[in-house]
Amino acid sequence: RMSRGLGDVYKRQLFQGLKIATHPDFEKHLNQYNVIHLNMQNFLSKTQTIEQMIALVTKAVGRDLLRAYPDIDYLDKSILTFMLDDVYQNYQVPFIFIIDEWDCIFRSRKNQLEEQTKYLDFLRDLLKDKGYIALAYMTGILPIKKYGEHSAINVFYEYSMTDASPIEEFTGFTEQEVRQLCEQYNLSLIHISEPTRHAQ
């Protein structure tokens, strides 16, 4: 879940050949952040309630923090936001959160509004207006929900497959990638570019 201390050479190889590696600020940002990756579906599938899921996320990330930063005098090891803030206050290394399938609870528990609200409260408390956050990136199918007066987590820019501006050039497949995939799977490029026809 937490990437810290990966060798500089490994991280350079990770980005080798990508456009980002040629950016003037690439070196400036390399190895400057703690990265926490969470796949929320993995946590949800191992628990019965939202409270259990949040507790498991807290336990897992907390354990990673304790392993990476054992020398810190943590205020309260049971409160994730306190632990993250303690790490940031001691080392001044901000966190990047990558949260995959952030919306899994909305898809699997559609009618459980109380659980959904608790989950949004957890995310808001974890991410919104926190000095330890450099960036949070969440993937999912559904847009970020708002509940009446409950502002939830309204600090995100939302991009979709149908409206990816201004990052559209970085999403989907380039023509060259489509050609390579067609060659790899022995498909006709003409066949791929034709719209799908459905039987009536």
What are these regions (language model features)?
Residues 1-10, 190-200:
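Single conserved hydrophobic/aromatic residue that forms the stacking wall/gate
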Residues 11-63:
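P-loop NTPase motor core
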Residues 22, 41-45, 103-104, 141-148:
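Conserved nucleotide-binding/hydrolysis micro-motifs of P-loop NTPases
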Residues 98, 134-141:
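Structural recognition of the conserved hydrophobic beta-strand(s) that form the central parallel beta-sheet
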Residues 91-113:
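Conserved P-loop NTPase "ATPase switch" module shared by AAA+ and STAND
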Residues 145-189, 193, 197:
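Conserved P-loop NTPase catalytic core
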Residues 86-88, 117-136:
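Substrate-engagement module of ASCE P-loop NTPases
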Residues 69-84:
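Short glycine-rich substrate-engagement loop in P-loop NTPases that contacts/grips substrate
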